[in-house]
Amino acid sequence: MASSPKAPKSHRKFQSIYHPTRPLSLWQDNQHDQGEVRIEIIPLIDVVFCILTFFILGAVGLSRQQAISLDLPRASTGAPQMREMFMVSLDDLGQLYVEKQPVSQEQMVSALQNYHQYNPSGLIVLHASRNASYNDVVQLLDTLRTVGGDRVALATLPGDGQTPSGMNPNSFNNPNLGLPGMTPGNAFPNGANPGMSNFNNSNPGGSGAGVPNFSNTPLPGMPDANGNVSPNPGMNPGFPGGGAMSPDPNSQSPNLPGMGNTVPSAPQQ
């Protein structure tokens, strides 16, 4: 087979310079050819929730009521107040504070009047320390009530409010509380009454222990209703109804008045 004739060098150089280029094929997404723009919702939701959380925390922190650090007493019967409140604090030394700022009583009254003017239904709360003087607390409450009326409350710490197991607070006022060997209306076990025979058990409800009735029992040495005097041995004979005492003749004690004639002891040599 005969070979093709070779082109001259000049022609080959011209062909290499002006060789036509082939078009490049680029990959294109045919779905976006229509010109639609899609917004990603999930990243937008994340950003919105982050901003919302920031604003919630900022609003709660800025709107919180500020007060002095006090040792408040506890109360299990207190009810939480959710209304708008005006805080007044009283420390151990009797110093007044309004919004953590020390004020005098006149300044506090002026602040209360301004608050009551713009918030007629607002609640005035007193934060009094546990060690504050009782007189200071009462006087301050009286001052607050002159401005706020019945919208004044004491701030306390919440208590557990639980009654100990096995304890019934009404049992202390129960007259029929049963004790071993005891019955209502009798103060001694099993109805025994040592040394006393007449008890006043006429209380039908048995609300208290039996009380001895001495209305018909005369006192020793004193006349009774019939004029009789009960004997009183061993007492001073100068007393009505008293018996005579027999002193010991060998006693070294001096004569006592009202003891009768006693024989003095012979002086010792």
Swiss-Prot record:
Annotated signal sequence range: none
Known Pfam families for this protein?
ExbD (PF02472)
How is it placed in the membrane, per its record? Answer: Single-pass type II membrane protein
Q: Mind telling me which residue stretches traverse the membrane in this protein?
A: 41-61
Coiled-coil portions? none
Is Glycosyltransferase set as a keyword in this record?
no
Alphabetic keyword roster: Cell inner membrane, Cell membrane, Membrane, Protein transport, Transmembrane, Transmembrane helix, Transport
Q: Name one GO biological process term.
A: protein transport
Q: Which GO terms describe its cellular component?
A: plasma membrane
**Composition bias type Low complexity, residue spans:** 193-204
What does the UniProt entry say about where the protein is found? Answer: Cell inner membrane
Periplasmic face of the membrane: 62-269
**Record keyword NAD present:** no
Region Disordered: list its residue ranges. Answer: 190-269
Q: Gene3D superfamilies, from UniProt?
A: 3.30.420.270
Q: Which residues lie on this side of the membrane: Cytoplasmic?
A: 1-40
Q: One GO MF term, please?
A: transmembrane transporter activity
Q: Which family does it belong to?
A: Belongs to the ExbD/TolR family.
Name of the protein in its database record: Putative biopolymer transport protein ExbD
Q: Which organism is it from?
A: Synechocystis sp. (strain ATCC 27184 / PCC 6803 / Kazusa)
